[in-house]
């Protein structure tokens, strides 16, 4: 074991200082947060900490307490959040900290739960958030250049950072004041951007660090993905794996600020899933190397309400395949397996923070990391890096079986209490179920294209960049011009129609010719620039061409935000006329920001004039583009999370009682959904689902936004969907599965005082649990033996205990939860001696009121 060095001495001095004051009867002493090369020290004590990202504006305030408590119950110590500048300062000097923007309330809720907080001020956040969290008005500060050594930008950034720090200080929220905030972050993932900028980037990064330190928060600052972070700022890692990361100084701890629990979804793409076996493997690899702080990005992803989604093309759902899903429900097995991982690692904490690992080879692709402390504490991590084969290894004269791509954790260097690949918790099957809400009665309002040239428009020569015109007050900008066609044009006499070609910098465009939709075109997140090319039907005389350019979230990654373009910058040209090509780019164009319905505030309950609304049955017969639909509904009974099923619609936006649910788009997902394995390096395209289906079909409707009755639902449809297909559904657990082997690791089999001695073997159990208000209605599958398949498609194998169904029905049906011990005696006899068996179960969950309590 290596000597701990000066960092260890410093931590002991801090600890003795604190204890000395307590012994002298001085009372409570706040010793603050410091660090050494092993870990963060809180009040002088080194800590292994697990953190979870929960972004306050991506859920509603009434959800915060439950989300944070679920995180705590899952073994989380710290809640991490970005701070979103564009929410808090929507216009220069005017601040908003109300509702979902109530940062103080969120941090106090963390404190109330007894957890710590990590405040990532940025103020650049990325986060798949509109404009990376920057307010768009910042783009128009004279002389500004983003994220570089630029005085206007630094002045604005300093002002906002200091405003947030002072707000936290005024509420005593830093740990140095007795609050929960133990870490703060300045900038975000700047390393690559700084390299591109050279000296200016380095100067800016150094300035940002000094500016942050000068705020005197009393807690450490971090910079993620910034190898040159100057002392005392800690540089940290983001990624799917961080076991190869090392801080830039030997006296700084290994901190993983973003352990990606999944990945975000983009319109037109599939959903991404990261197997929990691989996520647990990545975390265990980081800890076995000496890591002491892991933050799951995300632990609860939530929803991109309103127009907050960035990308562009990032979906309204920001579920992220996180342990707590978009709706605030626990995602199993990810939540439970990580909870067991946290518990196992915390058993090793004394050894982990007191020693350095001794690494030895125990096979061709297997290693042991052993932590032996002077106190006698010993913990070991046995790793199998082979992606194909399990390994049987010898460690401390004991054999251990390691599945492929897995790590076993031995808190006492003897008993394996956890293996990253052996999932013993249940899998919960989630479904969207009908509610008792009656069929919606719709009214519709058509955008009047003939009234676009009113006082809200302006005319100029040439094509203008979209955000410079809209200032991001709307997704929509009209580009309108006229084309005169002579009687002699050949296409008027049976010839080929002319072709309109439009080059756009993003993100979508709808083409109207003389008031009729002629075509649409869309970019993608990878290629936001696109070209539209289509035949158009013109008549003799003056023809009106109206192009509705649509933004689908502003980009959130990169530098020089001031230079980014959106909208139609051309060229725009007609081909196939008698004169050949007619370039329309530099003629007069008339512009209108937003839609008429937006100007009329049609989405708000107090602004829904009856003039212009018609019975939707008239529009359903022939769906029209650019149509507003409204209806009223009563809140469904119960407390299950709610969503709108938008499968029959096209693209647009949704509001409930004036609150924006967000953008919807039922674009079909393309990708490869054919294969998924937990083994091997994870990438977002590895485990995908939803190919050939709408990228996002369901849209979260927070219950906090509903009244008991007469809730106003407004939909703006760009393409012409059918509102009669829209329905309100509830998210609930429909069934649970579990599969546990005879010798599954059991934490009960570990007691530190029995190290090296024989002990009673505690047999593993299958645990099944439905959601609150539910009970197990039936057993769909049960087999103790060698069953085959996966959850939802199990089959009996060659070995099967005939009593399996009867045992599970007797112990579980009619109950909200049950546990069944995996033993031969429990099932009458050994169905296949000398064969490793497992108990596999699939159960159906239903409301308690509908489940009979009778059991055979």
Curated annotation (Swiss-Prot):
Main location: secreted
Xref: InterPro entries: BetaGal_gal-bd, Galactose-bd-like_sf, GHD, Gly_Hdrlase_35_cat, Glyco_hydro_35_CS, Glycoside_Hdrlase_35, Glycoside_hydrolase_SF, Lectin_gal-bd_dom
GO MF, one example: beta-galactosidase activity
Catalytic residues of the enzyme: 189, 258
Cellular compartment(s): Secreted, Extracellular space, Apoplast
EC main group: hydrolase
Segments traversing the membrane: none
Record field: catalytic activity: Hydrolysis of terminal non-reducing beta-D-galactose residues in beta-D-galactosides
Domain SUEL-type lectin: 760-846
Record bears the keyword Glycoprotein: yes
Keyword Amino-acid biosynthesis recorded: no
Glycan attachment residues as annotated in the record: 468
Signal peptide annotation: 1-31
EC nos: 3.2.1.23
Tissues where the protein occurs: Ubiquitous.
GO biological process: carbohydrate metabolic process
Protein family membership: Belongs to the glycosyl hydrolase 35 family.
PANTHER family from the UniProt entry: BETA-GALACTOSIDASE RELATED
Protein known as: Beta-galactosidase 3
Species classification: Eukaryota, Viridiplantae, Streptophyta, Embryophyta, Tracheophyta
């Amino acid at each position: 074991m290596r000597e701990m060095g000066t960092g260890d001495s410093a931590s002991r001095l801090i600890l003795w200082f604190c204890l000395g004051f307590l012994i002298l009867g001085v009372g409570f002493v706040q010793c603050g947060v410091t660090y050494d090369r092993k870990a963060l020290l809180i009040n002088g004590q080194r800590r292994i900490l697990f953190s979870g990202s929960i972004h306050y504006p991506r859920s509603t305030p009434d959800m915060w307490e439950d989300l944070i408590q679920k995180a705590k119950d899952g073994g989380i110590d710290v809640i991490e959040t970005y701070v979103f500048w564009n929410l808090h300062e929507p216009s220069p000097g005017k601040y908003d900290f109300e509702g979902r923007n109530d940062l103080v309330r969120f941090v106090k809720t963390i404190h109330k739960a007894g957890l710590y907080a990590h405040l990532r001020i940025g103020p650049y956040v990325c986060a798949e958030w509109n404009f990376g969290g920057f307010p768009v008005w910042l783009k128009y500060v004279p002389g500004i250049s983003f994220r570089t050594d630029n005085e206007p930008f630094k002045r604005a950034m300093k002002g906002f950072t200091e405003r947030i720090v002072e707000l936290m200080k005024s509420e005593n929220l830093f740990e140095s004041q007795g609050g929960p905030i133990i870490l703060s972050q300045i900038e975000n993932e700047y390393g690559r951007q700084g390299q591109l900028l050279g000296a200016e980037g380095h100067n800016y990064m150094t300035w940002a660090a000094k500016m942050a330190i000068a705020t005197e928060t009393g807690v450490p600052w971090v910079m993620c993905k910034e190898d040159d972070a100057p002392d005392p700022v800690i540089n940290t890692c983001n990624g799917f794996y961080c076991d190869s990361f090392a801080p830039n100084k030997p006296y700084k701890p290994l901190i993983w600020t973003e352990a990606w629990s999944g990945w975000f979804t983009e319109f037109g793409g599939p959903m991404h899933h990261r197997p929990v076996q691989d996520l647990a493997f990545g975390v265990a690899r980081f800890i076995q190397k000496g890591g002491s702080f892991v933050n799951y990005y995300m632990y609860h992803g939530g929803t991109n309400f309103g127009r907050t989604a960035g990308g562009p093309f990032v979906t309204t759902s920001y579920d992220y395949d996180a342990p707590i899903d978009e709706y605030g429900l626990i995602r199993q097995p990810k939540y439970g397996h990580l909870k067991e991982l946290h518990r196992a690692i915390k058993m090793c904490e004394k050894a982990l923070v007191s020693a350095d690992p001794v690494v030895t080879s125990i096979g061709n692709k297997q290693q042991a990391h052993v932590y032996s402390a002077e106190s006698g504490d010993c913990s070991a991590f046995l790793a199998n890096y082979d992606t194909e084969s399990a390994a049987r290894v010898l460690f401390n004269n004991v054999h251990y079986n390691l599945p492929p791509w897995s790590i076993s954790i031995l808190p006492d260097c003897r008993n394996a209490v956890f293996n990253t690949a052996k999932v013993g918790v249940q899998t919960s099957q989630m479904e969207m179920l009908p509610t008792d809400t009656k069929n919606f009665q719709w009214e519709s309002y058509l955008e009047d294209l003939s009234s676009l040239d009113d006082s809200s428009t302006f005319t100029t020569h040439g094509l203008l960049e979209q955000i410079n015109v809209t200032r991001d007050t709307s997704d929509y900008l009209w580009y309108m011009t006229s084309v005169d066609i002579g009687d002699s044009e050949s296409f008027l006499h049976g010839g080929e129609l002319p072709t309109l070609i439009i080059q756009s910098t993003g993100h979508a465009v709808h083409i109207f010719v003389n008031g009729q939709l002629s075509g649409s075109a869309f970019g993608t997140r990878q290629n936001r620039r696109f070209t539209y090319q289509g035949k158009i039907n013109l008549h003799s005389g003056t023809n009106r061409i109206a192009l509705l350019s649509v933004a689908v979230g502003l980009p959130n990654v990169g530098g020089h935000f001031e230079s980014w373009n959106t909208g139609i910058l051309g060229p725009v040209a007609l081909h196939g006329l008698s004169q050949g090509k007619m370039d329309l780019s530099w003629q007069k164009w008339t512009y209108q920001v937003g839609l008429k319905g937006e100007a009329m505030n049609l989405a708000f309950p107090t602004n829904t004039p009856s003039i212009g609304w018609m019975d939707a049955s008239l529009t359903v017969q022939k769906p029209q583009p650019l149509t507003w639909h409204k209806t009223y509904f009563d809140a469904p009974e119960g407390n299950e999370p709610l969503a709108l099923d938008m499968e029959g619609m096209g693209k647009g936006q949704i509001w409930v009682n004036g609150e924006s649910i967000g953008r919807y788009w039922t674009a079909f997902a393309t990708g490869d959904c054919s294969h998924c394995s937990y083994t091997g390096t994870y990438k977002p395209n590895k485990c995908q689902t939803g190919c050939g289906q709408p990228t996002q079909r369901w849209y979260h409707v927070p219950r906090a936004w509903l009244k008991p009755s007469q809730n106003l639902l407004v939909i703006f449809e760009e393409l012409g969907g059918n509102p009669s297909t829209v329905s309100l559904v509830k998210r609930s657990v429909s069934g649970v599965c579990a599969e546990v082997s005879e010798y599954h690791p059991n934490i009960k089999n570990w007691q530190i005082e029995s190290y090296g001695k024989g002990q009673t073997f505690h047999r593993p159990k299958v645990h099944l649990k439905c959601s609150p208000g539910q009970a197990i209605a039936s057993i769909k599958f049960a087999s103790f033996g060698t069953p085959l398949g996966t959850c939802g498609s199990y089959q009996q194998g060659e070995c099967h205990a005939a009593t399996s169904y009867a045992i599970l029905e007797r112990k579980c049906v009619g109950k909200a939860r049950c546990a069944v011990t995996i033993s031969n005696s429990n099932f009458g006899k050994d169905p296949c001696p000398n064969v490793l068996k497992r108990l596999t179960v699939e159960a159906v969950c239903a409301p308690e009121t509908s489940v009979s309590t009778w059991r055979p």
